[in-house]
Amino acid sequence: MTDVESNATGWSFAFLRTLVENGVTDIVVCPGSRSQSLALLAAEFADRELLTLHVVLDERAAGFLALGMSIESGRPAVVVTTSGSSVANLHPAVVEAFHQGTPLLLVTADRPESVRERGGGQTTFHVGMFSVAAKGTFDVPPAATPTDAERSGSTVALDALTTALRDRGPVHVNPQFIEPLSSNVPSNVFDTVVPGDLPEIVRESVIADVSAAVGVVVVAGLGAGARAEKWARDLGAPLFAEVASGAHFGPHLVTDYRTVAVNPEFADKVTTVVVVGRPTLARVIDPMCSRTGVDVIVVHVGEGVPYRPTDHARLVDDLVVTGDGDAVSREWAIPWARRSRMALDDRASEPAADVAGSLVEDHASRADFARREMEIQREPVTSEMLVRSVWDATWPHDRLVFGASSLIRVADSTVPGKPIRVHSNRGLAGIDGNIATAQGIAVASRQPGNPVGVTRLVIGDLAAAYDATSLALLTGPIQIIVGNNNGGRIFEGLEVAATANPEHFEAVVLTPQDVNFDGLAAAYGIPYRRVETRGQLTSALTETAEPILVEVVLRNG
């Protein structure tokens, strides 16, 4: 910083002050020269506990860290970068946030517009880089005077925050800074900053009336939340809730909905499908919605491109339920939910508790019991065993995150209902940024007054390798659980697998990798456990005091 007053600093102070006074709590700063006024002031705000500061070297990881915090808290997190390629590295998180409907504030310090087409160093075209994925773009010219800087910083901050909340997505703020890039700020100016609440956003709502009746089905996808479960009960409707929908629980939950949806005994009775959010995990929903005579109502949740399975699907913001759902449920939802639970129990790989065996007293019988228990503990881990064990170990005060791999689909079809917080980047379902997102969720969940829980990320080996540098971000109780089946085994289900050259398919589609996860963990100072058996998995899941990487060698895909 210099003693010469910098309009960049004046703008940055007004910008950050306005965000803090309007409910923003977290800022992620990436290193750089052009953004120094924002970065240095963010540190000052953090010293006074006005903001929580997160410093991240990798802009791609920074974007996903901010995304995770916004997903968990509902508050837009701020990401600050310098100019040039650093901005482009935010793009994966931006498009994921857009398709999820998650608010973010992206602040990319730029050189003045006059040098953009003159080949200036570290200068490119920030504006428009995120295309339609940015719900709003503010290209802010350099302030001419300190008064202009203060006015512009405050106005842009409030407008950008309001846009991100109202339109539920990422907003790009591109301030053009000129020298001097920073200056000292009197310490007493921070005394005037008072943290506030997020502004209230009022939206016009389109509301659909739905009557409880046999034939109504509720589908809960990305972003649905607990209201989907309540609507299912009010309507007396079976609930097809994806595992990360926020509605995978309750008496109407049909866990094997992939089978039920195509069962003629069920499908022929379907008259209305209420879809909340965007389903992403099963192919049976589209055909069910496309059946002749089926009315489709989609309750969108702010996602960038709402789910529209048919041209006649109605897009609404809310529902009003009428009729006697209890009477309908006894005939319609409860029988199918009960059949689903019975089918799940029949398929379960979890061993039943041998209560009788544990009570025997003679030596031979107790030895037999101990031998059987030991055999159970020595069973190799399968995908189903992994997700079920993690599911059973997770409580309402914990957070469970699924990466983009076959494991989330296994969980979606095998775990029973349970009211826990489950997240997954299903906007675009990419393998990038999964570890950083989980850390963001973990950080945001550790708020004063909240019970201290553990965040568990269940991730495939490819996604873990792809986001390995985000291991540097890990703090607090978080488990990175890597299901290692040596490559993208989810693609083994593709039709092309039956006709492609096996060696070529293995090399360019499954792409197996030889990753030393023990070495990766050591490089970032994280404890590591290798798990091959049920007993080892059970033990590893109890190690929750600090970050840990658990590599689970899977017997199957």
Regions found by a protein language model. Name each.
Residues 2, 6, 156-213, 326, ...:
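Conformationally flexible catalytic loops at phosphate/diphosphate-handling active centers
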Residues 108-155, 241-362, 495:
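Glycine-rich, acidic loop regions that bind phosphate or pyrophosphate groups
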Residues 26, 72-81, 96-102, 108, ...:
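Structural signature of the thiamine diphosphate
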Residues 67, 71, 79-82, 88-89, ...:
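Glycine-rich, anion-gripping cofactor-binding loops and their flanking helix/strand elements
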Residues 44, 96-97, 103, 107, ...:
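Thiamine diphosphate
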Residues 12-15, 20, 33-38, 351-452, ...:
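Active-site diphosphate/adenylate-binding microenvironment
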Residues 25-29, 51-54, 72-111, 270-277, ...:
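A short, small-residue-rich loop immediately preceding and capping a beta-strand
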Residues 1-6, 286-406, 516-519, 523-526, ...:
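Phosphate/pyrophosphate-binding active-site segments
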